[in-house]
């Protein structure tokens, strides 16, 4: 499975592509950041993020896009920008018929480090180790995007089995 991880942000939108299957060594195919100037008009920033993500989709042809689920932050302005960048990533994938998976920051941290309360340095160190890299990807947004892709590759098989079981249960006329 090839997954594009997206760590949404208006100024720095981390992107990373990981390929592999659960239980096997994973391979990083690409990592980077789509940047926009903080002083640019919002609409232009969103268009720049769209163009950047479209380039990644064209180049790497992922089977799925994993996006960090936006959660409540103390700074409303920050959460709005994150949500807007997240929506752009989801729109780009949906337009192409690529499935989108949302993962919370604590889900990603737990999947990659074993602790949902891990800090950025711990996530970066584990991404480096899991992907057999020489150094942690910089900035942290890039490492977070790879962590999202890793999380999805590892969690997708269990999520798919659960969805199939629920569908089978529903098809037999049972309710939850």
Curated annotation (Swiss-Prot):
Keywords in alphabetical order: Cytoplasm, DNA damage, DNA recombination, DNA repair, DNA-binding, Endonuclease, Hydrolase, Magnesium, Metal-binding, Nuclease
One annotated GO molecular function: crossover junction DNA endonuclease activity
Cofactor-binding details, from the entry: Binds 2 Mg(2+) ion per subunit.
Keyword Membrane set for record: no
EC number: 3.1.21.10
GO terms classed as biological process: DNA recombination; DNA repair
Primary site of residence: cytoplasm
Organism domain of life: Bacteria
Enzyme class name: hydrolase
Keyword DNA damage: yes
One term under GO cellular component: cytoplasm
Gene3D superfamilies from the UniProt entry: Ribonuclease H-like superfamily/Ribonuclease H (3.30.420.10)
HAMAP family membership: RuvC
Subunit structure: Homodimer which binds Holliday junction (HJ) DNA. The HJ becomes 2-fold symmetrical on binding to RuvC with unstacked arms; it has a different conformation from HJ DNA in complex with RuvA. In the full resolvosome a probable DNA-RuvA(4)-RuvB(12)-RuvC(2) complex forms which resolves the HJ.
Residues involved in Mg(2+) 1 binding: 7, 141
Family designation: Belongs to the RuvC family.
Name of protein: Crossover junction endodeoxyribonuclease RuvC
Subcellular location: Cytoplasm
Annotated catalysed reactions: Endonucleolytic cleavage at a junction such as a reciprocal single-stranded crossover between two homologous DNA duplexes (Holliday junction)
UniProt function note: The RuvA-RuvB-RuvC complex processes Holliday junction (HJ) DNA during genetic recombination and DNA repair. Endonuclease that resolves HJ intermediates. Cleaves cruciform DNA by making single-stranded nicks across the HJ at symmetrical positions within the homologous arms, yielding a 5'-phosphate and a 3'-hydroxyl group; requires a central core of homology in the junction. The consensus cleavage sequence is 5'-(A/T)TT(C/G)-3'. Cleavage occurs on the 3'-side of the TT dinucleotide at the point of strand exchange.
Obligatory cofactor(s): Mg(2+)
Positions annotated to bind Mg(2+) 2: 68
Alphabetical list of SUPFAM superfamilies matching this protein: Ribonuclease H-like
InterPro entries reported for this sequence: RNaseH-like_sf (IPR012337), RNaseH_sf (IPR036397), X-over_junc_endoDNase_Mg_BS (IPR020563), X-over_junc_endoDNase_RuvC (IPR002176)
